[in-house]
Curated annotation (Swiss-Prot):
Primary gene name: pyrG
Binding site for L-glutamine: Y54, G354, L382, G383, M384, Q385, E405, R462
UniProt binding sites for UTP: S13, K188, T189, K190, P191, T192, Q193, K224
Chain's role: Catalyzes the ATP-dependent amination of UTP to CTP with either L-glutamine or ammonia as the source of nitrogen. Regulates intracellular CTP levels through interactions with the four ribonucleotide triphosphates.
Species in which this protein is naturally found: Bacillus velezensis (strain DSM 23117 / BGSC 10A6 / LMG 26770 / FZB42)
Gene Ontology CC: cytosol
Family label: Belongs to the CTP synthase family.
Protein name: CTP synthase
Residue ranges, annotated region (Amidoligase domain): 1-267
Length: 535
């Protein structure tokens, strides 16, 4: 029978529940378990697709085109699995589904209520995740903080599941904070005690408490937490702040988190083989080189908006024994006169995806500077469109060339709306989303990176390169190294007379893994390392 683990959080948000859930998933997978994982978000939006990155951070896209929470990126990178649309559930999705059923008459005239209709729908989403993947274990992270009014239906639903399927098939892990009070020079357990009290008042007794802390906590403190929260002392797991996220699974394993889970759920687990993961952590701690990559974007104040890009750069760095430092550059502040100063000491420039006109001209200047000064350049999604516009303006001499998204009246719409998007009115869930094939042209940097003729990458865009300008661009040294199999959609562009200048319409950052870097990121960092060594 499938087992279900629920990860909740208390005291404050942003405790790292997602990292704990992902780490546990990795540990159980290495014990031979088939694992899937999902995130429940209590907000009323149907998905984060139309939310500002300042509100939510990155929107992570799955193979099947779901726009999801950034925690799914952590899940995929840690556990090395591909998730799907069942892996992210929001209040908006739940209420939408229930209301559709009510309109169809599925409830036979009954009064639709939070209990049982909303809670039943929530439980169904948990069970469905297991059925769709045939997983041994389903891990579900409950977003928000215990005590939030938005989370109450979610907590009630997972409370009911213990009675529905038996206590040995359900486990609750609660993440809390033990803050350090600098003036007193003490760690305090009281917030944890109150958070668990709140959770227990809702009918949920945690089996394990994971304590986030700035510094090691004493055994006496663990004993105190165990006493007041009515759990075994061994079930109080310390999660100290870490410089390297990938060391956390090893930290949790050392304290027996995965063994506690296996014992409680009566799982027949083999001994975990963490050799590859230990080698990764050792490598990360002993990188011998350092390079700097300038990231030119519009959301740089909130670095979570680019979290998969940053992690992908780091993964690629590991392959070259290089620590990748990010120089965050606000595209709105970039001008022709300061671009050299802003990117000083840079070994490579990356322009990631985005929407809207803010900062676009700064990104175009960055692409031009990288092209003219032979600095390795990588453009992603909007970054590819930016590179195309810059080349059209400054090499082909098409003054005023732009994207129809940014300037609908441009005389040269190098980037235009996808034909199937012309009659679309709703913004949410209507982009070109998910996994699509890309056919590569031989004797190009893209083909060299992938060493394959056809590759599959995840997309999230509404605009595309305008084929009316393809021949003109090709005749002037612009290389279309990747297209859709029918040749209609441009997927990858690059320059011949440049050490490494490549841009893609898709989002390669969504498929990178710490032990298996994404090919384009790997070659970009390889070129940047080479550039650094030649200085």
């Amino acid at each position: 029978m499938t087992k279900y683990i629920f990860v909740t959080g208390g005291v404050v948000s942003s405790l790292g529940k997602g990292i704990v859930a992902a780490s546990l998933g990795r540990l159980l997978k290495n014990r031979g378990m088939s694992v899937t994982i999902q995130k429940f978000d209590p907000y009323i939006n149907v998905d984060p697709g139309t939310m500002s990155p300042y509100q939510h951070g990155e929107v992570f896209v799955t193979d099947d085109g779901a726009e999801t929470d950034l925690d799914l990126g952590h899940y995929e990178r840690f556990i090395d699995i591909n998730l799907n649309r069942f892996s992210n559930v929001t209040t908006g999705k739940i209420y939408s589904a229930v209301l559709k059923k009510e309109r169809r008459g599925d409830y036979l005239g009954g009064t639709v209520q939070v209990i049982p209709h909303i809670t039943n729908e929530l439980k169904d989403r948990v069970y469905r995740a297991g059925k769709e993947t045939n997983a041994d274990v389903v891990i579900t992270e409950i977003g928000g903080t215990v005590g939030d009014i938005e989370s109450l239906p979610f907590l009630e639903a997972i409370r009911q599941m213990k009675s529905d399927i038996g206590h040995e098939n359900v486990m609750y892990i609660h993440c809390t904070l033990v803050p350090y009070i600098k003036a007193a020079g003490e760690l305090k357990t009281k917030p944890t005690q109150h958070s668990v009290k709140e959770l227990r008042s809702l009918g949920i007794q945690p089996n394990i408490i994971v304590v986030r802390t700035e510094m090691p906590i004493s055994q006496d403190m663990k004993d105190k937490i165990a006493l007041f929260c009515d759990i075994d002392t061994k079930a109080v797991i310390e999660c100290e702040d870490a410089d390297n996220l990938y060391s956390i699974p090893l930290n949790l394993q050392e304290q027996g988190l995965d063994k506690l889970v296996c014992d409680h759920m009566k799982l027949e687990c083999k001994d975990p083989d963490m050799t590859e993961w230990k080698d990764l952590v050792t490598k990360v701690k002993n990188l011998s080189k350092t390079i700097t990559i300038s990231l030119v974007g519009k959301y740089v104040e909130l670095q979570d908006a680019y979290i998969s890009v940053v992690e992908s750069l780091r993964h690629a760095g590991y392959a070259f024994d290089a620590d990748v430092k990010i120089k965050w550059i606000n595209a709105e502040e970039v001008t022709e006169s300061n671009i050299q100063e802003l990117t000083g000491g840079t070994d490579g420039i990356i322009v990631p995806g985005g929407f809207g006109d803010r900062g676009v001209e700064g990104k175009i200047i960055a692409a031009k500077y990288a092209r003219e000064n032979k600095i390795p350049f990588f453009g992603i999604c909007l970054g590819m469109q930016i590179a195309s516009i810059e080349y059209a303006r400054n090499v082909l001499g098409l003054e005023g060339a732009h994207s129809a998204e940014i300037d609908p009246s441009t005389p040269y719409p190098i980037i235009d709306l996808l034909p199937e998007q012309k009659d679309v009115e709703d913004l949410g869930g209507t982009l070109r989303l998910g996994l699509y094939p890309c056919k590569l042209q031989e004797d190009t940097k893209a083909f060299e990176a992938y060493a394959d003729e056809v590759v599959y990458e995840r997309h999230r865009h509404r605009y595309e390169f305008n084929n009316e300008y393809r021949q003109q661009m090709e005749e002037n040294g612009f290389v279309f190294s990747g297209t859709s199999p029918d040749g209609r959609l441009v997927e990858i562009i690059e320059l011949k007379d440049h050490p490494w200048y490549v841009a893609c319409q898709f989002h390669p950052e969504f498929k990178s893994r710490p032990t298996r870097p994404q090919p384009l990121f790997k070659d970009f960092i390889g070129a940047s390392v080479q550039a650094a060594e030649q200085k």
